From Swiss-Prot:
HAMAP family: NaMN_adenylyltr. Catalyzes the reversible adenylation of nicotinate mononucleotide (NaMN) to nicotinic acid adenine dinucleotide (NaAD). This is Probable nicotinate-nucleotide adenylyltransferase. PANTHER family: BIFUNCTIONAL NMN ADENYLYLTRANSFERASE_NUDIX HYDROLASE (PTHR21342:SF0), PHOSPHOPANTETHEINE ADENYLYLTRANSFERASE (PTHR21342). It comes from Stenotrophomonas maltophilia (strain K279a). The gene is nadD.
Length: 222
């Protein structure tokens, strides 16, 4: 049985305690390292509030030297090599699949909201041939019951009962984490900062210090 490689992509704008909780849950349940991969400029989201370099720095501060959490900057590097090209997950997974070979198990870690919006992703149906999905559900909202329509048909037969299914094949299965999503969201954190509300407790201390020192996410002064 080949070892599993897990990547957790996102804008991390800013990285908050909910992001880290998801990464740690996947690391602990699957007993493999999680590689956190900041996106350049995702085509299906608004332009991030911090620069790519700032988001990378914040993620590096959040991870520190914590065992089992690693940082991968390939999407940011690709944006430098090909300025103006959209950052698509399918391109990243194809690059990873080329590096790892066709047989190595590969998984993409997401929150439930991302999976439910999968049909808006570029070449979304191709993703299942490239990687597994590991999904953090929201408390009190069973993911499988929320999926219907085109996505529901695409996910039929892919749900894994346990983590061994991810190690047994290279791609195509969906595993739900036992640890549910926390309530934090990056958009809520940005809104709290802009409004002058309490926000520090939502971020790792080193990230909170960085945000404050650089004046990130504050409302423009009239």
């Amino acid at each position: 049985m080949m070892s599993l490689r897990i990547y957790y992509g996102g804008t991390f704008d800013p990285v908050h305690l909910g992001h880290l909780a998801i990464a740690r849950a996947a690391r602990d349940e699957l007993q493999v390292a999680v590689r956190m991969l900041p996106a350049a400029d995702p085509p299906h989201r608004a332009v991030p509030g911090a620069t790519a370099d700032q988001r990378f720095t914040m993620l590096s501060l959040a991870i520190g030297d914590e065992p089992g959490l690693l940082l991968d900057h390939r999407e940011l590097d690709r944006a430098i090599r090909f300025p103006g090209r959209p950052s698509y997950t399918v391109d990243t997974l194809r690059e990873l699949r080329g590096e790892l070979g066709p047989s190595r198990p590969l998984a993409w870690l997401v929150g439930a909201d991302s999976l439910l919006g999968l049909t808006r992703w570029h070449e979304w149906e191709a993703l299942f041939g490239l990687a597994h999905f590991v999904v953090a559900e929201r408390p009190g909202s069973p993911l499988q019951a929320s999926v219907d329509g085109e996505l529901g048909r695409a996910l039929e037969g892919r749900w894994a009962d346990n983590e061994q299914a991810l190690f047994a094949s290279p791609a195509g299965r969906i595993l739900r984490l036992h640890h549910p999503l926390r309530e934090e969201s990056a958009s809520a954190v940005r809104a709290q900062i802009a409004a002058g509300g309490p926000w520090r407790a939502l971020l790792p201390p080193a990230v909170a210090d960085y945000v404050a020192a650089h004046g990130l996410y504050r409302s423009p002064t009239p």
